[in-house]
Structure formats: C-alpha cells, structure tokens
Amino acid sequence: MVVAKKMHVAKKMSKEELREDKVVTAVKRLGEFGQRNIRYIAGGAALLLVLIVGVAFWSQNRTRAAEAASLGFSQAQQLYFSGNYAEALARFQAIESQHGSRGAAQPVSLFIGNCQLSLGNPTEAESAFRSALNRLSGDPILRAGAQRGLGAALADQGKMAEAAAEYQKAAEVSDNPLAADDWLAAAAAYGEAGNSESARQAYQKIVDDFPSSIHLMDAKLRLAEIAARQG
C-alpha cells in the first residue's frame, strides 16, 4: 500500500517539480564532487567548482531549441563529475558548436574551461574563460565563476600577479557565495607574486568581512606570518 501511494504521488509531480528535482540531483552530485576534490578547489588550481546557480540556470530557462541539447548536456555533466574530462570536453564543445553559449547555454562555456583545466591545458582554459567573459550577460554569479576560472588558468601558467587580479575580481562580485574562497586564492597568488601588501589586504578582507568562513583561522595565521616577516 505504501509503495502504491508513493507511485501515485510521483505521478502527480508537476513539470516544475520534476525540473526542480533534476536540479537537486545535479546539486547533490556537485556537492559530492566538491568533497572529493576540495584540496584542489580550495587552492584554486587544477579544478574549478562550477556554481550551483549555473546548473540551475540551465535547467530552469530552457527554450525549445535548448531542449534539443538537454540530454547531451546532462550526459556531459555526468562524464565531468565522474572525472572523464576528455570525453566531457568533447560533449560540451559539441553543444557549444551546435547551440552556441548564450542564454540558457551560458554554463557550457564554463564547463569547457573547467575541463581544460582538469586536463592540464591551462592555456586552452584561459582562452575558454576569456571567451566566456566576453559572451556572458549580466549574470554576476556566472561572471564570478568565469573570473575564478581565468585566475586558476593563469595560476597554472605561473602568471601569479595576473591570477591574483582575476581572483580579486571574482571576490568583489556582489553576492558571490564563494567570495571568501576567492579572497584566499587572491591572497595566495599575491604572495607568490611577491606582493606581500596586497596579500595582507586580501587576507584581512577575510577576517573583516567573513568572520564565519572556514578560512578565517588560515587568514589570521597568514597575517601573523606576514607581520613577523615585516618585523
């Protein structure tokens, strides 16, 4: 009886609820992926956590043209989250080629950059993220993701001063849920570039503006180290 009741309820789910359920599933996979790769994500290099908003944006803003790419996008995501970056990249590039990367397809360009980063192709990743920034509309969260990806691509090329500037741009995006992470990445990059004052300011931003961040103690420790070096 219980099983039958559950089946009856499932049949009454609206299209909106089904779409939301797909978003929740994608978010859960994203969270599991982040937990497995947090060492890389926190460092800002090799991998970039694609924002949940981007996944939801794709799922909730479909047009008839985008419906044709929906299945391919879902399959490409599964490949990406399972670590099959080469095949995922080919799928995302095919979607971009056939459907473009504007409107609801904007997250595709971010996934392409992420795949290139994960495959150890920082130059190609830089190109992908710069292209994404040129095409993105006014969505600030997607722009923050592209700036963060560009910072990671530059850092992987050893261009630490440029990387720091891009991380800072991402951190300064209004309502960026990963702002503290971006300030931490910016501070580390500034430090590696030899700009201790900018590094200090970035760490201080975490202390001042994000007192509940998991990076708070790390920021305080780095500030103490900088102060000790400066005598």
Question: Where would I find each of the regions flagged by the language model?
Answer:
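N-terminal positive-inside, membrane-proximal cytosolic segments immediately preceding the first
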Residues: 2-44
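TPR-repeat structural position
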Residues: 85-86, 122, 160, 196
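Short solvent-exposed coil/turn linkers within tandem alpha-helical repeat scaffolds
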Residues: 96-105, 134-143, 171-179, 207-218
